[in-house]
């Protein structure tokens, strides 16, 4: 599936670059205002897949979201209140995240969308399933670019048999190292960014 939507490719690639670069900053999020008309908020995720996948608690609570993901979203959003209030409302807010950060970004977008902030878009890379069908219905009209790279195993968690779903269709990125069949290594955010650059170039 190619990338369809209203966001220019420069915005999408800048968001993915921020998702890659947020890790060395050792902070919960990274804000970029480099592209006119857009503010990008990249939420920190994790490149270490085994630790948190193993320890996931799969029970969906009454708010139809994974408890750990929702707690992380609330904590991150609380840190963003001051920064978000200072943003220009005429600029589109692009919320992005990789891995756990993708699930967190989805739930932050849900919180903002439900509170009437509709001038937003969502970009996720290698995100696990963030919640159930009620969440999917709530944000079905939200513009969302959901990238999956190669054989990344993280988007297959938590299990759909436990009630978890993805909220939007996938945009498949070819393996940046096409001789590799490693579902853990394919989760690397640097490879996501490189594959997205190639994806856009191939679809020009």
Question: Would you name each region that the model predicts?
Answer:
Residues 1-96, 100-204:
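Non-catalytic, mobile gating and regulatory segments of ester bond hydrolases
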């Amino acid at each position: 599936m190619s990338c369809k939507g209203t966001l220019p490719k420069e915005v999408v690639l800048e968001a993915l670059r921020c998702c890659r670069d947020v890790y060395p900053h050792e902070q919960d999020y990274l804000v970029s205002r480099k592209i006119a008309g857009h503010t990008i908020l990249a939420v920190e995720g994790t490149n270490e897949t085994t630790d948190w996948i193993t320890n996931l608690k799969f029970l969906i609570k009454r708010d139809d979201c994974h408890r750990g993901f929702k707690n992380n979203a609330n904590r991150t959003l609380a840190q963003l209140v001051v920064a978000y209030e200072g943003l220009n409302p005429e600029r589109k807010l692009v919320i992005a995240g990789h891995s756990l950060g993708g699930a967190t970004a989805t739930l932050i977008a849900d919180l903002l969308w439900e509170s009437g902030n509709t001038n937003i878009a969502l970009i996720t890379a290698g995100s696990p399933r963030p919640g159930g069908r009620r969440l999917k219905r709530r944000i079905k009209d939200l513009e969302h670019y959901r990238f999956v790279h190669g054989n990344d195993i993280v988007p297959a968690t938590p299990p759909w048999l436990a009630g978890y779903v993805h909220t939007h269709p996938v945009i498949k990125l070819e393996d940046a190292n096409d001789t590799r069949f490693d579902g853990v290594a394919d989760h690397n955010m640097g490879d996501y960014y490189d594959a997205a650059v190639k994806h856009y170039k191939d679809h020009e």
